[in-house]
Amino acid sequence: MGDGLDAVQMSGSSSSQGQPSSQAPSSFNPNPPETSNPTRPKRQTNQLQYLLKVVLKSLWKHQFAWPFHAPVDAVKLNLPDYYKIIKNPMDMGTIKKRLESAFYTSAQECIQDFNTMFTNCYIYNKPGDDIVLMAEALEKVFLTKISEMPQQEVEISTTAGKGRGRGRRDPDMNMKVGPVLEPLTASPQTRGLSNLTPGPQTRGPPQGPPTLPPQPIVQIQALPPRVPPSLPTIPLHAPQLGPPFSLGPTDCNPPAPIITAVPPPTQTALPPVHIQQSAAPPILQTPISIPNKRKSQKRKADTTTPTANDQLNESSPAESKSGKTLPRRDNTRPSKLPKKEAPDSQHHWTAAPGTPSPKQQEQLRYCSGIVKDMFAKKHAAYAWPFYKPVDVDTLGLHDYHDIIKHPMDLSTIKDKLETRQYREAQEFAADVRLMFSNCYKYNPPDHEVVAMARKLQDVFEMRFAKMPDEPEEMLAPAPAPVLHPAPVKTQPVMATASSSDTSSDSSSESESSTDDSEEERAQRLAELQEQLKAVHEQLAALSQPQASKPKKKEKEKKEKKKDKHKKKAGVMPALEEILEPPPALKPQGKPKNKDPLPKKSKKLSKKEGGKSNRSMAPPGAAPPTLQPVPGLDTEEDLGLTGGAAMAGMAAGEKCKPMSYEEKRQLSLDINKLPGDKLGRVVHIIQSREPSLKNSNPDEIEIDFETLKPSTLRELERYVSSCLRKKKKPAVPEKSMEAISAVKTKGTSSDSGSSSESSSSESEDSETGMASKPKKRGRGEGKKAHHQTTAPGMPLPQVPLQPQTPALQPSIQLKQQQPQHPSPAAYMPPPVTALEPSQLLENPFDPLAHFMHLPHHANDSSSPAPPHLNAHPPGGPVSPETHPFLNQHPILPSPALHNALPQQPSRPSNRAAPLPPKPLQQSTSQQQPPPQQTLVPPQQLQPQQQQPAPPQQQHLPHHPLHAPQQMRPRPLSPPTLTPQGLLSSQPPQMLLEDDEEPVPSMSLPMYLQHLQPNRLQATPTSLMQSLQSRPQPPGQPSLLQSVQVQSHLPPPQLPVQTQVQPQQPAPHQPSPQLSQHQARHMQQLGFPQGPLQTAQTQPGQHKVSMPSTKAQQIIQQQQATQHHSPRQHKADSYNSAHLRDNPSPLMMHSPQIPQYSLVHQSPSQDKKEPQRGPSALGGIKEEKLPPSPVMRGEPFSPAMRPESHKHPDSKPTMPGHSQQRADMKPLEMSRPVIRSSEQSGPPPSMQDKEKFKQEPKTPSAPKKVQDVKFKNMGSWASLAQKSSTTPSSGLKSSSDSFEQFRRAAREKEEREKALKAQVEQAEKDRLRKEQEKLRGRDEEDSIEPPRRPLEEPRRRQEPQQVQPPPQQHQTQAQAQTLNPAQSPSASQPTQAPPQSPASSQSALDQQREMARRREQERRRREAMAATIDMNFQSDLMAIFEENLF
């Protein structure tokens, strides 16, 4: 890119062109400016090339450039006076031609032409004219580009033979610069005017903006005539200008000429390395030629500076310019060489002046990084005036040297750093401060340059203050690799270690980038890509076994600490870090040692690192390496850890060094990581790289070359673990990567994505305590448990679900561990039982034990989980019953695999993994374990969905739906298992099971316990509170369910809060009872947990009903009105249907029903309590009788046991019997309530129950679904909402064989459901009426305590009630039940008293319900504009119903 007119023209044309106005006064236009001069030697420099390829190219394409493309046509534009006023016309067309013809001898000339062009425009035109505005815009772009121009001008010419040093450099130049030189030489551009060089160097004052300060340097370098042979081969790429700039200013220093005597051998040795590193070496050599263009010195022209006149020219503009530049370059190369490679050491001869101690060297490297940072683009806006020596001539500052006796600039400082003229950092700081002092001294305080100096000084002082006190490692070994990657953009702090090398490299790279960058870059990229591929392969190989390394525990400890700081990073990185903690401290500064191509590859990597920010990024190899950390410029990192780099090599080499291919693959893999996992990557790097400890975790610039092998291996392990997890679940479920992407986005609408994000985030973020189990789950699970332990469950699952199980299990383990100690042990129920407890011991030990119990307690069910397909529990339970109880997981597992959304098994997984606990819980969890064990594939998805609970937090978009989905999933295992909801829930029941049962049972309990904390309680705190409260052994299951939901509750709380806002206080008063009930329900079928939760919540609601009975009843009634018809019907036919083929529907419409379930689940929860109290008998008849009828099949004890259905639960198991015992109070209260309610609405309740039984009767073998049926009550309500939805949803998602079988059942159930819905609607009306009467009485007694809670519920319920009118009707129907149920639920023992109380408060309740309904209607109307998840779920349910 040309400089512009010749020196003469430049001087002549101070403002020759204004706008493209006519150039001729009137009749003619003068001849255009000269574009070629055969008498002038053609010269091409890196800066001229930059001006042509970058500056002119960008300006030419600018939208405002068209007026300047050609000389002003004064005739055409009718500007007769233009050429009278403008004596030196100039235009971009002329400049372009001059650049292309190598007319300019220095970039300063071209810049002068540009300035003349702009000045002419400003002179001839009025200030506000459009052409002036266009010119200003163009000038701004021009100045911006110029600020990025290489600071040192290096001649690029075919005459490369000058200088002995050049002898070796010639090959270098030929390799790097040669190609560039040849093309340049071929084109007129290469012509450098050796004669003119002095003139250009004088730097005709740029008429343009002062941004030309770099120009002086360019001019100095522009002394090509003598130097052309010298290798001013390739200034850093024009893009690299910023960093390279520093070289330019230093080039001007007079000392350089003296240093010019560069030992030819050194330079000779240097060239090859130089080429690879960058064209900078020539620049270094230029000092040899002294002022004569560092080029000649670079080229190893005689150490005697043949181009002394250059020095004179340079020195005239600025003493420091000419002198400094040459020595700097010369020394720069040597400094680089010793650091990077032996070849570079050639230039070391110049470094001889001072041999600082390792500490000083490290600090000087850091200083070099600071300089680099100051040359970075981010500071260019205010740093550009300091890039080069003050151009006194160009700027017309004739008194400058009178006032400023010791001029200083960044280029001079950089050159001095590179030539090792500084013995310690303080000397460097003194020069930098001198530069700023000169600025403050010469310029007035209000001058813009002073403001810019202050800004830049702030940057410098901050960076300098952070300089490491102690050398991290010898800079010689590690810096070389580091320097390469740390081109211009490397963080100055990090580049300190390699700063001198880095700066020289950056300058050389920028210089040579244009010449050799293309060819060498392609070669380097190819090599790097190959190396990265090899690295990637190694990483893949290493990543698999690495998890089992013995160091894992140590890493876990470290990781745990790290996880606390960076929960989002992910467990695997911590594990990886644990594997190689000592190596981490050691920088990977010796990539060269690692690779057979240490020097070349290092250079490549260095350029990759350094250039990758600029040019390497595009190449596949280097950019990937840099990509992982976008701003990583390890060069500077190494610079910071230059001393440490060598030590790091020693230690790092202990670990197998990474090949460039491996590094490339690692960078690619890091780029694949979701955003939430990158924190871990940064943490690993910072924890293992002392030089990066203080770096900004949000933005780190590192070069893989500077990282210690141990750090790289740790990163490799972590990334591979993350990607493996992603990919494994991705196969069965949508794709772990996609999931992780969703995870990264924080959107876990997909259970798959939720599982993914849950796995990573729940591990790290769910709980500090959980983080350890998570890590163990991942590390141990992957390694030790990879086989069969809870953490290993993922691997066991892999066998079950070959592709996703391993990853998902690990993910599940992570969340399960946080949520439940047992979830990790899902896959192998027995082993997992132990593992989960162990894993969960830290965060959730009690739960872990309880969770373990379910597996054992699930003897019938627990075996089933492992043998879900086999239906081992089928013995106790009919095949259908068993499949749903124990096969819920089985069927859901396919469905879950098919559709991530329906991963209720995940909750079951949580419940299941804790089989070792009491049988009661085992009973409740029994079904979840079946889900977990029965369907490892399902578990994978459940596990993924267990991560999904964390996603629930991420699923705020579906406040009710997502939260419940997430929580229900943790809880869904119980719910699903009990009713086979897992299989049938996907459309509605699964969702309800997951959402409502979980909210009902676990969430209500959770809310009751948590409500004082109200949704604020964290899963851990929730679990802790529940655990602290577990009164009976059975309670742990409730706690487990709550804990399962503890991760889930925040999302679920909205729905459940609606149902339970009033309950929390009452429930807390009787947490034991409610917990027992919930626990027993869970014990009866923790998988039933959701349904049981619904029932338990009713029980709990009943328990708390005395205080919040009216509110709960009203809210529940409203919910019942919304959900009751469908829910009851769905309960009736869905229970049977779900039991028969729960997984099809559940699996088919997991996502859609999830929403409906979510919104319906609260209402269903309410309905169940309503049914419990108002028609407890009805509910029991509905649920217990229907569930028996539906579960007419021998329901497995684990599946069947429900506290609500004592008959069923009794047959189930002792734990279940206990649950029954605990539940009996609930049931007793319900029966009492039932009797009281039945007095009025018993027929309706019974009819409804009959209807439910009728639909469920077909699935009578599904006795296991007693508990499920209760959950199914809500689930069935959803199914009934979409009468065909449950069956249809179940069909679609069920296993193929299950789908067929369920399809037939669903058809029957649909018909029954339709009938049941009609009957239920009538029954609900009767119930509502009766309940209203009872509720009024109850409300009178309960109204005071209930009202406070009622308001939140009203607010929450309106959301639930808003969506579907059917839901409103259901709620209305259920409301009648709820008043009765609420009292009975509030106090199972108080049920009889509450019956009268409910009758007493019936009027109050009715009034309150009427108020609530009206309020809800108004709220619904107000909320009509908002998206109601409940409504959407209803729509989905209806849609699914229509599908079948």
UniProtKB/Swiss-Prot annotation:
User: Compositional bias of type Basic residues: which residue ranges?
Assistant: 549-569
Instruction: List GO BP terms, alphabetically.
Output: chromatin remodeling; positive regulation of canonical NF-kappaB signal transduction; positive regulation of T-helper 17 cell lineage commitment; positive regulation of transcription by RNA polymerase II; positive regulation of transcription elongation by RNA polymerase II; regulation of DNA-templated transcription; regulation of inflammatory response; thrombocyte differentiation
Instruction: Identify the residues that the record assigns to the NET domain, covering every copy.
Output: 633-730
Q: What is its main location?
A: nucleus
Q: Where is the composition biased (Polar residues)?
A: 186-196, 303-319, 1090-1109, 1151-1163
Which parts of the sequence are annotated with region: BID region? 538-610
Where are stretches of biased composition, namely Pro residues?
Answer: 206-216
Q: Where is this site: Acetylated histone binding?
A: N125, N443
Q: Where is the composition biased (Basic and acidic residues)?
A: 327-347, 1246-1255, 1298-1357, 1405-1422
Cite the residue spans of the region called Disordered.
Answer: 1-44, 154-217, 279-362, 492-523, 540-645, 722-986, 1020-1422
Tissue specificity = Widely expressed.
Q: Which InterPro entries match?
A: BRD4_CDT, Bromo_Brdt_I, Bromo_Brdt_II, Bromo_chromatin_reader, Bromodomain, Bromodomain-like_sf, Bromodomain_CS, NET_dom
The lineage's top-level taxon is Eukaryota
Which GO terms label this protein's molecular function in UniProt? histone binding; lysine-acetylated histone binding; p53 binding
Using the record's annotation, list all stretches that form the Bromo domain.
Answer: 43-149, 358-467
Which cellular compartments is it found in? Nucleus; Chromosome
Task: Enumerate the residue ranges of region (NPS region).
Answer: 498-517
Q: Where is the composition biased (Low complexity)?
A: 11-27, 498-511, 746-760, 800-823, 919-954, 1036-1046, 1110-1121, 1282-1296, 1367-1389
Q: Name one GO cellular component term.
A: nucleus
Question: Which controlled-vocabulary keywords does the entry list?
Answer: Bromodomain, Chromatin regulator, Chromosome, Nucleus, Repeat, Transcription, Transcription regulation
Region (C-terminal (CTD) region) spans which residues?
Answer: 1126-1444
The family line of this record is: Belongs to the BET family.
Question: Mind telling me which PANTHER family this protein's record contains?
Answer: BROMODOMAIN-CONTAINING PROTEIN 4, FALZ-RELATED BROMODOMAIN-CONTAINING PROTEINS
Note on domains (UniProt): The 2 bromo domains mediate specific binding to acetylated histones. The exact combination of modified histone tails required to recruit brd4 to target genes is still unclear. The first bromo domain has high affinity for acetylated histone H4 tail, whereas the second bromo domain recognizes multiply acetylated marks in histone H3.
Q: What does this protein do?
A: Chromatin reader protein that recognizes and binds acetylated histones and plays a key role in transmission of epigenetic memory across cell divisions and transcription regulation. Remains associated with acetylated chromatin throughout the entire cell cycle and provides epigenetic memory for postmitotic G1 gene transcription by preserving acetylated chromatin status and maintaining high-order chromatin structure. During interphase, plays a key role in regulating the transcription of signal-inducible genes by associating with the P-TEFb complex and recruiting it to promoters.
Q: What's the protein name?
A: Bromodomain-containing protein 4
Organism the protein comes from? Danio rerio (Zebrafish)
Its taxonomic placement starts with:
Eukaryota, Metazoa, Chordata, Craniata, Vertebrata
Give the gene name. Answer: brd4
